[in-house]
């Protein structure tokens, strides 16, 4: 996955402001659709909401490792470039390969497909689970542990994380 390119728009001199606004709107919505289809947005929103409601405070940054890697930086699994991965820098510091990320996504998708209710309003997602269900409790604990990874991935894909 490549980092999101910033959305830029220049209004040609000969174009009216209305026509320019329409072109910008179309370009913006195309970019929004690209983000939706290139990343498990629903899963991401769920994770961030779980964390937000738990009152968790986290801070993460991400360097993307995807074949084209700068010289001189080594990760826990050897020289950069050996293992295509995301290297996440948090207080604990951990390293997630693409295979591990795929497993995370599969598990999360399975959790979502089991049917916890998700209500969306604006940019807010609310998760409702059965607190008496050990599977739901375990899934929530697991989601919290993955929060730093998904927050960093969100930033990589142009989402605002707060």
Task: Please provide the spans of the model-predicted regions.
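Acidic (Asp/Glu-rich) sequence patches and key acidic residues
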Residues: 1-162
């Amino acid at each position: 996955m490549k980092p999101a390119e910033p959305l830029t728009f220049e209004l040609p001199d000969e174009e009216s402001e209305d026509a320019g606004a329409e072109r910008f709107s179309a370009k913006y919505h195309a970019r929004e659709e690209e983000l939706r289809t290139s990343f498990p947005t629903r899963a991401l929103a769920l994770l961030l909401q779980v964390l937000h409601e738990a009152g968790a405070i986290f801070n993460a940054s991400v360097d993307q490792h995807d074949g084209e890697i700068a010289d001189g930086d080594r990760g826990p699994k050897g020289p950069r470039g050996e293992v295509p991965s995301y290297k996440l820098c948090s207080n604990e510091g951990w390293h997630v390969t693409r295979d591990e990320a795929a497993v995370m996504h599969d598990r999360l998708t399975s959790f979502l497909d089991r049917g916890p209710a998700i209500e969306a309003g604006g940019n807010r997602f609310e998760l409702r689970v059965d607190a008496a269900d050990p599977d739901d409790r375990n899934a929530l604990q697991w989601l919290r542990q993955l929060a730093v990874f998904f927050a960093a991935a969100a930033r990589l894909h142009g989402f605002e994380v707060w």
